[in-house]
C-alpha cells in the first residue's frame, strides 16, 4: 500500500473479507475414497483430515500407505487420484480449499483413485 499514491489503506469491507478468506469453518473434513476400474477397494473408504494445514500430497501419501504401495528401496506402484472424477489437483493444493469448492451434498470430498490413468 505504501507505493500507491491514492490508496493508503484497504477499505473496511475488503479488510474483513481478507480476514475470513483463508479460514475454514470446520477443523476436520471428511474424505470419501472411491476406486475406479480394477483399483482395490478400501476397508474404510471414509477418512477425516485436517482442513487448514494438510495439502493434497498428504491424501496421496495416506492412500499409498493404506494400499501398501510403498515398498522398501523403490517408488512402488503408481496411484492416480481425482476429485469428483473430474480432475487431478496439484499436490500443493490445500485440502480445505478443495473441500470448500468441490464437496458433495453430504459435506464430503469425493476422491476417486485408480492404478492407471483414468481420465485424459
UniProtKB/Swiss-Prot annotation:
List locations, semicolon-separated: Preautophagosomal structure membrane
Keyword hit for DNA repair: no
Identify the keywords attached in UniProt to this record, alphabetized. Autophagy, Isopeptide bond, Membrane, Protein transport, Transport, Ubl conjugation pathway
Instruction: Fetch the InterPro entries from UniProt.
Output: Atg12 (IPR007242), Ubiquitin-like_domsf (IPR029071)
Q: Name one GO cellular component term.
A: autophagosome membrane
Q: Which domain of life is it from?
A: Eukaryota
Membrane topology value? Peripheral membrane protein
Which GO terms of type biological process are on file?
A: autophagosome assembly; autophagosome maturation; autophagy of mitochondrion; glycophagy; piecemeal microautophagy of the nucleus; protein transport
State one molecular function term (GO).
protein tag activity
| Glycyl lysine isopeptide (Gly-Lys) (interchain with K-97 in ATG5) crosslink residues | 120
CDD domains (UniProt xref): Ubl_ATG12
Tagged with keyword Metal-binding: no
Q: What does this protein do?
A: Ubiquitin-like protein involved in cytoplasm to vacuole transport (Cvt), autophagy vesicles formation, mitophagy, and nucleophagy. Conjugation with atg5 through a ubiquitin-like conjugating system involving also atg7 as an E1-like activating enzyme and atg10 as an E2-like conjugating enzyme, is essential for its function. The atg12-atg5 conjugate functions as an E3-like enzyme which is required for lipidation of atg8 and atg8 association to the vesicle membranes.
Question: Which protein family is named in the record?
Answer: Belongs to the ATG12 family.
Q: Subunit arrangement?
A: Forms a conjugate with atg5.
Protein name stated in the entry? Ubiquitin-like protein ATG12
Instruction: Give the organism the record lists.
Output: Sclerotinia sclerotiorum (strain ATCC 18683 / 1980 / Ss-1) (White mold)
Amino acid at each position: 500500500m505504501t507505493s500507491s499514491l491514492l490508496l493508503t489503506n484497504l477499505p473496511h469491507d475488503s479488510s474483513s473479507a481478507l480476514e475470513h478468506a483463508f479460514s475454514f469453518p470446520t477443523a476436520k473434513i471428511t474424505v470419501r475414497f472411491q476406486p475406479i476400474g480394477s483399483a482395490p477397494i478400501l476397508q474404510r473408504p471414509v477418512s477425516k483430515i485436517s482442513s487448514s494445514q494438510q495439502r493434497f500430497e498428504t491424501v496421496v501419501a495416506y492412500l499409498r500407505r493404506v494400499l501398501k504401495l510403498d515398498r522398501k528401496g523403490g517408488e512402488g506402484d503408481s496411484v492416480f487420484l481425482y476429485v469428483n472424477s473430474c480432475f487431478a489437483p496439484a499436490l500443493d493444493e490445500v485440502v480445505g480449499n478443495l473441500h470448500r469448492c468441490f464437496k458433495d451434498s453430504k459435506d464430503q470430498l469425493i476422491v476417486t483413485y485408480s492404478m492407471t490413468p483414468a481420465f485424459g
